[in-house]
């Protein structure tokens, strides 16, 4: 399902992210501008997204969401790589289609997480010896994703992926609603930076 970068209605313009509907049932509305009634614009966006099969709709962008509840808050976290503990685990770059399948399973319940139909650039499996313990994605100096496939191995997965970044500072985004991840990053001493994305839902 294709996204609509420019959805124009009588009351404004928005971008509709529809690609997550087939798997997650979620559509994302990014308000670009309102030149009439905000509620009128959102109502038109809702109608289109529902007709495309959306069960849940999340909102962001240039609008007043004070009457909405926060669905996901993505915060920048950072830590000098030298501050991370050593690990025997190793991250190995992969093009194996299993990566996308496992990623989608791991992040199915994480708000605003994307779905992969193919293996992206910078995809890694994390091994302890010959045992697969996790997966992740590295983009430059940022860990774009990390997931443990074995309970209690999140720290090892993170440290193994950190060895693959460019630069000396490990950067990542963390959904504040993903409490296990928040606890892990807090325990390692990651700083809390700016909120990069915030998504809302109707109350």
Language-model segments: residues:
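Active-site rim helix/loop that mediates acceptor-substrate recognition in acyltransferases
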Residues: 1-10, 106-129
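Short amphipathic alpha-helix that is part of the acyltransferase structural core
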Residues: 1-2, 83-113
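Conserved donor-binding loop and adjoining core beta-sheet/short helix segment
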Residues: 1-47, 128-150
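Acyl-donor-binding surface of acyltransferase catalytic domains
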Residues: 30-88, 196-201
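Conserved acetyl-CoA-binding loop-helix of GNAT-fold acetyltransferases
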Residues: 37-48, 150-165, 182-187
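Conserved hydrophobic beta-strand within the GNAT/NAT acetyltransferase core sheet
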Residues: 57-59, 143, 170-174
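Conserved active-site tyrosine of GNAT-family acetyltransferases
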Residues: 63-68, 184-185, 190
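A structural microfeature
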Residues: 72, 132-134, 194
């Amino acid at each position: 399902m294709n996204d609509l970068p420019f959805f124009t209605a009588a009351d404004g313009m928005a971008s509709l992210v529809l690609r997550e509907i087939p798997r997650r049932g979620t559509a994302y509305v990014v308000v670009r501008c309102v030149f009439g009634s905000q509620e009128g614009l959102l109502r038109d966006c809702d109608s289109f997204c529902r007709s495309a099969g959306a069960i849940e709709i999340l909102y962001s962008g240039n609008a007043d969401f004070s009457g909405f509840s926060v669905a996901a808050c993505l915060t920048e976290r950072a830590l000098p790589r030298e501050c991370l503990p050593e690990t025997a685990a190793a991250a190995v770059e992969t093009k194996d289609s299993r990566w996308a399948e496992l990623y989608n399973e791991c992040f199915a319940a994480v708000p605003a997480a994307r779905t992969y139909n193919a293996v992206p650039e910078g995809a890694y499996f994390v091994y302890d010896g010959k045992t697969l313990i996790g997966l992740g994605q590295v983009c430059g100096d940022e860990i774009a994703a990390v997931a443990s496939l074995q309970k209690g191995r999140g720290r090892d997965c993170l440290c193994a992926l950190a060895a693959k970044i460019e630069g000396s500072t490990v950067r990542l985004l963390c959904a504040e609603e993903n409490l296990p991840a928040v606890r892990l990053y807090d325990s390692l001493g990651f700083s809390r930076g700016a909120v990069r994305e915030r998504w809302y839902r109707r109350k």
